[in-house]
Amino acid sequence: MYPAFTVAEVRRAEQLELDRLGEDVLMRRAARGLATVVLEELRRSAGRVYGNRVLLVVGSGNNGGDGLWAGVTLARRGVRVSAWRTGSAVHAAGWAAFLAAGGRELDAAGALAELSRAAVVVDAVTGLGGRAGLRPEVAGFAAACATRRVPVVAVDLPSGIPADPPFVVPAPAHFPATTTVSFGGRKLCQAIEPARSACGRLVLVDIGLGTMTPEVVCWEPADVLAHWPVPGPSDDKYSRGVVGIDAGSASYPGAGVLATTGAVRAGAGMVRFVGVPEVAATVVERLPNVVAAPGRVQSLVLGSGWGRRPDGARIVAAAIDGGLPVVLDADALTLLPEVLHADVLLTPHAGELARLLDVPREQITADPVAAARQAVAQTGATVLLKGASQVVATPGHEAVELAVPGPAWTAQAGSGDLLAGICGALLAAGLPVRLAAVLAASAQALAAARQGGVPPQELDLQAALG
């Protein structure tokens, strides 16, 4: 797992070091790390360092200073370095050192002309305080970088992308980072979509900041392997966990099949299908190891593909009152009682959560972490917000967790039904709700990634999981 931090938290940690060491020490550390990455990029993309051209695009703040001091190091290594100052001001000491090292100043027109010869562009325009979008002149240059496919190394973050949410969809004008060099730790824009993809390859540079409190904790594939429940030699089907599933309807029978398949392939010891008879017949035909009869269970999955269910509210209320961990998906999310608890797992996508919170859908996608937290505060339940970044928020836990990211191919009908079943299986195995949610979303993402660059069908995902 790795943490990601807000701008405020990074600045707090930076200020402690600035007070202790001064600005120059931190900036030189950052510049050395940045120069190392640019040199690596030159070797990778151009095959050599000496004599190649690097174009710095620098703003007025410390971000620009980092770029200029890195330019000094590059010039001393034989790189032909030029710089375009995008504003009226510039970091004075860095600019003087850059010129003294043989760096060349360009205006906007000169920078565009130099772009055809540059092996690497360093984006040092804005830093942590940057807003979404770029001034027209800079936006035009950034677009030219994308058109000409010049490698771009961004300093801390791609200019035009804010460090903290909200993240606008589609993204405003920004530099197309091939690589982003982040100082002191990951920022939220480097962990949460759609900003994450705009950052390209991420390289972390340690500049000696102290302990910081993360806003989100991001899961990695190794974490899934470490936490996945594995049966022991004395386990049987009951001790592995029995999950009860009521999903699907005459109009949407496939939802029942998919939710049940997810639970089976995720390793449930037994799956009881307790939904409507017309769906039960289809489920048992596809999955003969499923028991289509009521009985004791350790978790419940409700709502996927229900449509309008006259007895739905009663079923949901009874499940919540029963004290078992419950997954509420899709149509069950419209039938919530006033009182929920942390063992209830809500699995909305952005549209469903927008309706639940009575806010525009765009507000959910722009800041999924805040949206998931708001849902927890409003309902008292644990929330798995599905989407490009899958967010798990839990009552009593300050940090939000992000599942392992997966390919965009998983954005297809049926993914949520499948995920609900996986969640149910992990809950039946005895995992805490928070852990089951992030494990399930991560496992689905990893299974999709194994399918390669083609649109996976949901049963293919389950074949990969199995």
Language-model features and meaning:
Residues S88, L128-R131, P162, V168, ...:
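Short strand->helix junction
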Residues A119-V120, V125-V216:
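Internal gly/pro-rich beta-alpha loop/helix module
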Residues A92, A139, A171-H174, A366, ...:
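Short, conserved loop/turn and helix-capping segments at secondary-structure boundaries
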Residues T36-V125, G133-V155, I315:
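Nucleotide and nucleotide-moiety/phosphate-recognizing core
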Residues M1-R85, T179, G185-A330, T334-L345, ...:
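Small-residue (G/A/S/T)-rich helix-start motifs and N-terminal tracts that mark the onset
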Residues Y2, V90, D107, A111, ...:
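Generic hydrophobic alpha-helical membrane-segment signal
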Residues L115-A119, H174, P294-G295, I320:
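A short, aliphatic-rich alpha-helical micro-motif
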